[in-house]
Amino acid sequence: MRLAPQKPLLLSTVLHLLLSIWMLGFASLAGATVQEPLAASDTPKPVSAALFSSIERLSRLVDITYCVGNTGVWKPFACASRCNEFPTLTLERTWRTGILMSDSCGLIAVDHGTPRHDAGEGKDDPLAEKAIIVAFRGTYSLTNTIIDLSTIPQEYVPYPSPDDGGNEPPREPSHRCDNCTVHSGFLASWRHARKVVLPELKVLRQKYPEYPIRLVGHSLGGAVAMLAALEMRVSLGWRDTVVTTFGEPRVGNRQLCDYLNAVFELNLGDEMDPAEREYRRVTHADDPVPLLPPAEWGYSSHGGEFFISKKDLPPSVEDVLVCHGDHDENCIARGKSSAVSVPAGDYDDALSTLEEQDVMLADALPWIPARLKLWELFFAHRDYFWRLGLCVPGGDPANWGRKGGEGAAESISAEG
């Protein structure tokens, strides 16, 4: 069954995005203790040309995941979008656990580093390298997920919960996650995906033991990739897991972010070559999602950020900056460096700071100023080297409302 989303649905998503942005303005009103995150050490510098190319390639790869549940991705590695740009990949499987916001969608592929026999002469990918790739798709309504879906944080443990057949970690973890909380909706999405992803990866790791694991995700998929990476590294001991996310929302509290920084050694600062980072969190100018859910709900950002400073497409090497710390004020944080630390169980106290603002929000909506340019904010979350989210050849022939192009919001379709 194919469903064509209607214009009001997309408008509703934009309005939810506005509400989320509006909530960011109340971070300073929270009554919880403010804990300083890792600070920026100096002015960000551009990435190297090689790192730029590597991240750009992954943005095209994660764009392909939007074909899953739409027109499809099929073996050996074909789709209606950019699959022909990856002649060295073979598809292992796709998954789609359902249509609810807590469900997950994506693909697992193997990059053999050399073109497939069916790729044809002249087909090559100079950036290809041997790897097992797991790509997590985003959602067309991430803001709905953030606001409406189980936003109450829950306790986080870095190994499978009893619900997932776990009880104790398989070994004494080298890092502890004390008093960590996680967005329960994002965790539910990973729990749905892990039933498919982990068994497949265990088989592939036996088949290709020398291939590292590369996780990539956009939007909600970035949040799921983060939780997947922590479990793979800590619980399963897969140290060769490297992560790249685009427009990743905040997933947990300050303690969880500190934990991730330690696991992926993001707290080394300038001691680490940016190209050697094993967690790359890519953000884009004016994209509000990396700052959501807001800090007054007990959420924070972690390190590893690379910031696309140019608003319009396409960016150049000089536009992609290496950020420092968790909240580099030269990057997506833009001065919003305070992170509210809300211990497990104290969510209601933090949320109570918002209750008095409900009437103010209702009164403010009729006077939304046109200068906010809501469509530009919506597109900013899609614009990561390319405009992501359309399963069409070349990614975005209609430009989706960019300067000089016609909007094509009505053309999205998805399978139910």
UniProtKB/Swiss-Prot annotation:
Enzyme Commission code(s) on record: 3.1.1.3, 3.1.1.72
UniProt enzyme class: hydrolase
Pfam families: Lipase_3 (PF01764)
Subcellular localization, as worded in the UniProt entry: Secreted
Reaction(s) catalysed by this chain's protein: Deacetylation of xylans and xylo-oligosaccharides; a triacylglycerol + H2O = a diacylglycerol + a fatty acid + H(+)
Post-translational modification: Glycosylated.
GO cellular component, one term: extracellular region
Temperature dependency: Optimum temperature is 40 degrees Celsius. Thermostable from 20 to 50 degrees Celsius.
Keywords carried by this UniProt record: Carbohydrate metabolism, Disulfide bond, Glycoprotein, Hydrolase, Lipid degradation, Lipid metabolism, Polysaccharide degradation, Secreted, Serine esterase, Signal, Xylan degradation
Sequence similarity: Belongs to the AB hydrolase superfamily. Lipase family.
Function: Lipolytic enzyme that possesses both lipase and acetylxylan esterase activity. Also highly active on the acetylated compounds xylose tetra-acetate and oat spelt xylan.
Protein name: Lipase A
Organism: Sodiomyces alcalophilus
